[in-house]
A protein has these predicted regions:
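Terminal low-complexity/disordered tails
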Residues: 177-235
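Short, structured coil/loop segments at alpha-helix boundaries
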Residues: 37, 52-59, 97-117, 216-227
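Activity-critical C-terminal alpha-helical subdomain
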Residues: 95-193
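RecA-like P-loop NTPase motor core
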Residues: 2-102
Length: 235
């Protein structure tokens, strides 16, 4: 009600309505997104930020909580066994790294791991996948055109001191996909420490910026459909 006039708001999200009724009483979010780790959390939050910049500012958006829970199997078992922790009005989603879809599921099928296959099948409607594994996606992006992305990060951080470490980017080390992921984590850690020393921002803020840059660049590739992915996740 405003100025004595009562108006109806159609199709609003539950927490918007409850917030008006409870006048500040804490309520559950409209959507909870479980991710594997802090890297996944930073990527989801960057995707949400990008989505909200594109959304109609006059349309109410859902409240979102992004929660790191550990390995993907722990996430699946947690969601499967504890659905009662959140009210029915809260949408539960899982955003898993690309390697789960490409490697882990194939491995379960090859080994006929019926328990894990049944778990994936039960929760399939709630599972979404990043178009990359965060650290690997970032390193692949930077390695593909290092000069362009060095300049891109100068603009992103608004700091001309941004530059690559010596002998950067490192050559991709041949090996298994698991070895590539571990190497990507080490390479990103080296880059993060280097940029932290150069521009004087916290390690966490630099990591957040690098993943936000990854999401921004990925959103420019229609094949990755970043906006569609996050929209389908939260609605």
């Amino acid at each position: 009600m405003e100025a004595g006039i009562v108006s109806c708001l159609k199709d609003c999200y539950p927490t918007f309505a409850l917030g008006q009724i409870t006048a500040g009483e804490e309520v559950a979010p409209d959507c909870v997104i479980y991710v594997e780790d802090d890297s996944g959390k930073k990527c989801v939050e960057a995707m949400l930020h990008h989505y909200r910049r594109q959304a109609d500012p006059l349309v109410a958006q859902p409240t979102i909580a992004t929660v790191p829970l550990g390995g993907f199997s722990q996430i699946l078992e947690f969601v499967d066994k504890t659905p009662q922790l959140l009210p029915a009005t809260t949408t539960i989603r899982m955003m898993l790294d690309e390697d789960v879809r490409l490697e882990s599921l194939a491995d379960y099928e090859a080994r006929q791991d019926h328990y894990m296959l049944a778990l994936f099948n039960r929760l399939n409607g709630q599972i979404r996948y990043f178009p990359w594994t965060p650290e690997t996606g970032l390193m692949d992006l930077l390695r593909a055109n290092s000069a362009t992305h060095e300049n891109g990060l100068k603009r992103y951080f608004n700091d001309q001191r941004v530059s690559w470490p010596a002998s950067w980017p490192p050559a991709e080390v041949p090996g298994t996909q698991a070895q590539r992921r571990r190497q990507a984590k080490r390479d990103m850690s080296t880059l993060t420490d280097h940029l932290q020393a150069l521009i004087g921002r916290s390690n966490d803020r630099v990591r957040e910026g690098l993943f936000d840059y990854l999401v921004q660049q990925s959103a420019m590739n229609p094949a990755l459909n970043i906006l569609g992915l996050i929209s389908q996740t939260i609605h």
